Amino acid sequence: MQHVETHPRRVRGEAVHMTASEKRASEISHNSAMGLNEPKIQVRIKSPANMDCSYEIISEESRHRAIEEAFLTPESKHFISTPEVVEMESRLALWLEAGYPVHLIGPTGCGKTSLAVHVAKELGRPVVWINGDEAISTSDLIGGYSQMQNESVRDNYIHNVFKTKDTMKIEWVDNPLSLACKYGYTLIYNEFSRTKPASNNILLSVFEEGILELPTKFGEDRYIKVHPDFKAILTSNSIEYAGIHRPQDALLDRMVGIYADYYGYETEVRIVVEHTGITLDKAEKIVNVVRSIRDKLPDAQKPGTRACIMIAKGMTFLNDHQNIDFKQLCIDVIASKTSSPADMEEKKKLVLDLVD
């Protein structure tokens, strides 16, 4: 007689209980179906409606790439190095290495953002990006509870006992500041003075005590110890433009301030050539005109290096538009900061007097 081992309890030919191997296989199958095999990293930000800003990455190794893709840090293309640029780079790098956040102050169009991005990339750490805005709140900086996950478990381990369990979880989604503090990323907070001061209060304890508090969380999860590799570069305009808020003194006191003025003549010429590919003599002509206009206009209306680049790019298309000349290009670019028809006429006359 041959003995065949069977399950200890069978009802109508079928096993009542699962074996240990069957239970393990069932758990693996359930976890796979629920997507629980590996931790998920989720990144979410506010941005224009036409952009897809939600990313769900399965593997831990993809975290850095996902963060940089989600927060869309601009590339510092065509960055040029001259003695004055290198000096600014060195000053920023020194204070960042010393552990202080750097506040880069300067007029619009002088190259603050390009410098901040370049220095941040040179640090060799992932970079996250925030653009200051009137509508930015504390949650936009640190994150918040964004979605609910409903999980149901049905268990009939014993044939005549049916157990059910419903669990509802609210998931927390980190935003740039939380990510930078947790993992030691470099934070660039562009035009931070456009954000209401109350929203930036969260930065006080980050910069001073090295602690990020998440007000909407509870218990141990409420506090994050700032990673030792965390760095922060904040930029703001030195002129009182529309939409600018004066930052609180307590925050300014925790940062090192570096003033970035318009670059010198040689540097501006090199920047224009590098960005547009025009000849040196044309770049010199453009920079001379813009710098002369800059000297004659009030601070809030001064054209920056960006204006030089715009005129130069316009020049590359003049052959296709024979009825437009260099003077008109200059007038159109300078007119972007015009407040009235009389102001426009004054600037037009200024350009005509400067351009032969």
What does each of the following model-derived ranges do?
Residues H3:
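Cationic, low-complexity basic patches in intrinsically disordered or flexible, solvent-exposed regions
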Residues H7-R10, E14, T19-E284, N288, ...:
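AAA+ P-loop NTPase catalytic core and its hallmark functional loops
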Residues A20, P83, D281, R306, ...:
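Alpha-helix boundary/N-cap detector
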Residues E68-F71, E75-F79, I324-D356:
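C-terminal engagement/docking regions of AAA+ P-loop ATPases
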Residues M148, M315-L318, S336:
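Phosphate/oxyanion-binding loops and surfaces in catalytic or ligand/nucleic-acid-binding neighborhoods
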Residues V153, M310-G314, D332-V333:
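Short secondary-structure transition/capping segments
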Residues V269, T276-D325:
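Conserved AAA+ ATPase small/helical "lid" subdomain
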